[in-house]
UniProtKB/Swiss-Prot annotation:
Membrane-spanning residues: 29-49
Upper lineage: Bacteria, Bacillati, Cyanobacteriota, Cyanophyceae, Oscillatoriophycideae
Pfam short name (any one): PsbH
GO terms of biological process kind: photosynthesis; protein stabilization
An example Gene Ontology CC term for this record: plasma membrane-derived thylakoid membrane
Membrane topology, record value: Single-pass membrane protein
Name recorded for this polypeptide: Photosystem II reaction center protein H
NCBIfam families the record matches: PRK02624.1
The protein's assembly and partners: PSII is composed of 1 copy each of membrane proteins PsbA, PsbB, PsbC, PsbD, PsbE, PsbF, PsbH, PsbI, PsbJ, PsbK, PsbL, PsbM, PsbT, PsbX, PsbY, PsbZ, Psb30/Ycf12, peripheral proteins PsbO, CyanoQ (PsbQ), PsbU, PsbV and a large number of cofactors. It forms dimeric complexes.
Keywords assigned: Membrane, Photosynthesis, Photosystem II, Thylakoid, Transmembrane, Transmembrane helix
Assigned protein family: Belongs to the PsbH family.
């Protein structure tokens, strides 16, 4: 038998709608926002890697 946890009880309402299609756009807008934030995160990491984003006191030396 599966063990009940507090986290499981919190997440249960999300799983109760499994297999059903939300009317309209549903959570598409929220997904788009998170994708945009993830893109910004990746761009910042890329700029740090290319040293085009200079951070004071943070030396990036790849050839040790």
């Amino acid at each position: 038998m599966a063990q009940r946890t507090r986290l499981g009880e919190i997440l249960r309402p999300l799983n109760s709608e499994y297999g059903k299609v939300s009317p309209g756009w549903g959570t598409t807008l929220l997904m788009g926002v998170f994708m945009a934030l993830f893109l910004v995160f990746l761009l910042i990491i890329l700029q740090i890697y290319n040293s085009s984003l200079i951070l004071e006191g943070f030396n990036v030396d790849w050839g040790q």
